[in-house]
């Protein structure tokens, strides 16, 4: 109970809650046509009032000062997220134009294309005029043998259509365009071969670019070791956060086993690495002020580790939290400095970038650490074990249960699945992750040493293979994963409330009151009641046309419909998916009734030919069609008086069945 009371009494915790609430509410509800400057004017007024109250320093006005300060940070959060959104959003031309930019990340292979983040600096207007843009996009390009390959830091000139990706939220619950916007990316584009050129090599790289290049060089070293593909992919992900080589099958194995967190560089890896460093440099503690020197040395080395891993947001967040915790230990011996440093880290990161609040890894990371700080002492003290090995096992299980308990509402809300054997998997993961980290850094140092280097690399490969096989074994156990348990936002909030009430009840110990049990039971009953109402409600089944596929969705269940001929019958509704030239040679004595003709990339022919075979009620033009062919089909629809829907304008089309 003391942990929570100490946290609530911490002024920065209250201000952080106000800041986060402002970010969330303004991002969700602020009208798009209303400028953030109106809120800024009110904020300046509140800052003046807050300063005046602080200067007067009357004890009886302390609540007023606290309230005004809370509203001030609430508005600051809202204004900052609106300003951040404005700096990312851009009205791109609705057609291909020429752009100039700089490659900001290391290009990665995506099927037949390469993709990288590009900082678009200029857009060409009519004539020889150029317009300043200064926005980041995800640029994909087809390899061109006539142009030198692009690398991080290169200047590039390309001809392409830049646009914001269409939202998939109605179908999948995920808005890719909004996701990119919160990552600071304004749009996406595809440049075909011959439509891009490398116009210059960099004289100097930015600090972030140097980190990305450093990360790629480490990946190149891993590739030179001749490891198996899955082994190299896991080593790259586990040690430096490079996940592009992870296959969907490998990700599914770790997800089902409840160990996917080991593939995302985060606090677990920083914690393991810091333990290794503390053990290596422990002799420094025998010197005068040795403990402080050791702590500062570990912090510096952790920031070096963050640089090598490409300064990814997850590892930077973990290192910031560790650094603040170390600083707090210098300034205070208070028991709750860990919780305070966690709040300070969240506050500083939201001030720096308010979009962090919507990052799933940010939410999971802070929820896990908060839950560990709260629940781990309760779990670990619940059993008194004297045997060292058994105590280590119990402490590891306590850590896993604490983290899983805090992240449970987020996992069920975002992913709708729960790994049943996560405790078994994490017993293996924690040990082998540490072994792989040690062997990897040893291999980097000793790879050039004859015999010794090859031996370490072989041990690394064996250790990673054991990890992969162990996770496959856990995945193959009966009932290894509970799926399709999606929670609504209200259910997730109530489940979080249940967990908080459970903590309050457990932490009270012998001082537990009847009110603690009543509070827990009330929230549990609310959660059950809301769940019953939401699951009992009938949701209509809907038909979707999106990305050259036909889907049906009922609640959280999405099904894809395909056939060899392209003809579908869904609820007595006839649909044709047209993506080839097969219908050009067909003839018919009578026209077949067709509710929807879904024309996609690859279709050869014309609507006049289709009109002889089918009585089409509505044509749907997929966004994959090129502009000239789409315009031709639209003219034919108008001529034949057939209604049509252009998905290049709205992204997807849905019908209630």
Predicted ranges, named:
Residues 1-29, 328-329, 334-336, 442-473:
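Hydrophobic alpha-helical segments
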Residues 1-90, 94-96, 317, 500-517:
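N-terminal leader/targeting segments
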Residues 2-5, 57-66, 70-261, 587, ...:
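Membrane-interface helix/helix-cap signal primarily in integral membrane proteins
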Residues 14, 22, 59, 189, ...:
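Hydrophobic alpha-helical transmembrane segments in multi-pass membrane proteins
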Residues 22, 101, 160, 238, ...:
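Divalent metal-coordination and catalytic microenvironments
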Residues 28-39, 360, 419, 482-487:
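Membrane-helix interface and helix-disruption motif detector
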Residues 145-148, 154-161, 179, 388, ...:
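Non-globular, low-confidence helical/coil segments that flank catalytic cores
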Residues 207-222, 234, 242, 250, ...:
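Hydrophobic alpha-helical segments of integral membrane proteins
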């Amino acid at each position: 109970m003391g942990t929570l009371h100490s946290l609530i009494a911490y002024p920065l915790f209250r201000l952080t809650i106000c800041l986060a609430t402002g970010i969330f509410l303004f991002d969700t509800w602020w009208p798009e046509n209303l400028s953030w400057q109106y809120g800024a004017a009110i904020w300046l007024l509140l800052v003046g009032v807050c300063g005046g109250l602080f200067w007067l320093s009357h004890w009886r006005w302390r609540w007023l000062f606290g309230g005004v300060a809370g509203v001030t940070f609430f508005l600051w959060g809202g204004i900052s997220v609106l300003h951040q959104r404005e700096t990312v959003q851009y009205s791109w031309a609705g057609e291909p134009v020429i752009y100039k930019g700089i490659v900001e990340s290391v290009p990665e292979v995506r099927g037949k294309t390469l993709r990288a983040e590009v900082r678009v600096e200029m857009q060409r207007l009519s004539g020889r005029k150029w317009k300043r843009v200064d926005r980041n996009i995800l640029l994909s390009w087809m390899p061109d043998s006539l142009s030198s390959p692009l690398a991080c830091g290169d200047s590039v000139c390309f001809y392409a259509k830049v646009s914001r990706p269409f939202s998939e939220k109605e179908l999948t619950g995920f808005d890719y365009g909004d996701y990119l916007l919160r990552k600071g990316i304004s749009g996406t584009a595809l440049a075909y071969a011959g439509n891009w050129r490398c116009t210059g090599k960099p004289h100097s790289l930015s600090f972030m670019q140097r980190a990305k290049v450093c990360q790629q060089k480490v990946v190149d070293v891993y590739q030179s070791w001749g490891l198996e593909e899955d082994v190299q992919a896991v080593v790259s992900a586990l040690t430096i956060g490079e996940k592009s080589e992870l296959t969907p099958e490998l990700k599914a194995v770790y997800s089902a086993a409840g160990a996917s967190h080991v593939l995302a560089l985060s606090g677990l890896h920083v914690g393991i690495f810091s333990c290794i460093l503390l053990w290596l440099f422990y002799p420094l503690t025998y010197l005068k002020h040795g403990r402080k020197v050791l702590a500062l040395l570990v912090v510096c080395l952790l920031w070096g580790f963050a640089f090598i891993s490409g300064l990814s947001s997850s590892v930077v967040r973990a290192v910031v939290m560790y650094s603040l915790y170390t600083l707090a230990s210098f300034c205070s011996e208070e028991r709750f400095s860990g919780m305070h440093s966690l709040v300070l880290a969240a506050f500083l990161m939201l001030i720096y970038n308010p979009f962090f609040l919507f990052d799933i890894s940010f939410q999971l990371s802070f929820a896990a650490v908060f839950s560990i700080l709260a629940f781990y002492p309760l779990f670990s003290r619940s059993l008194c074990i004297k045997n060292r090995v058994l105590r280590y096992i119990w402490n590891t299980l306590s850590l896993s249960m604490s983290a899983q308990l805090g992240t449970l509402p987020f996992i069920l809300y975002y992913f709708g699945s729960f790994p049943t054997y996560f405790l078994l998997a994490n017993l293996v993961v924690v040990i082998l992750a540490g072994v792989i980290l040690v062997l990897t850094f040893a291999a980097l140092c000793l790879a050039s040493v004859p015999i010794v280097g090859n031996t370490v690399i072989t041990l690394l490969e064996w250790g990673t293979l054991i990890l992969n096989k162990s996770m496959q074994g856990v995945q193959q156990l009966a009932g290894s994963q509970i799926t399709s348990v999606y929670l609504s936002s209200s259910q997730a909030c109530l489940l979080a409330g249940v967990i908080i009430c459970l903590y309050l009840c457990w932490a009270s110990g012998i001082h537990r009151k009847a009110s603690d049990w009543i509070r827990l039971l009330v929230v549990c009953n609310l959660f059950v009641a809301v769940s019953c109402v939401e699951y009992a409600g009938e949701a209509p089944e809907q038909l979707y046309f999106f990305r050259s596929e036909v889907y049906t969705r009922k609640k959280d269940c999405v099904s894809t419909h395909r056939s060899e001929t392209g003809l579908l019958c869904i609820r007595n509704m006839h649909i044709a998916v047209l993506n080839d030239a097969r219908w050009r040679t067909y003839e018919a004595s009578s026209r077949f009734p067709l509710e929807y003709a879904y024309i996609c990339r690859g279709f050869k022919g014309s609507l006049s030919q289709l009109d002889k075979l089918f009585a089409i009620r509505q044509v749907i033009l997929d966004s994959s069609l090129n502009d000239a062919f789409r315009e031709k089909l639209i003219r034919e629809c108008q001529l034949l008086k057939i209604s049509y829907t252009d998905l290049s304008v709205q992204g997807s089309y849905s019908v209630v069945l």
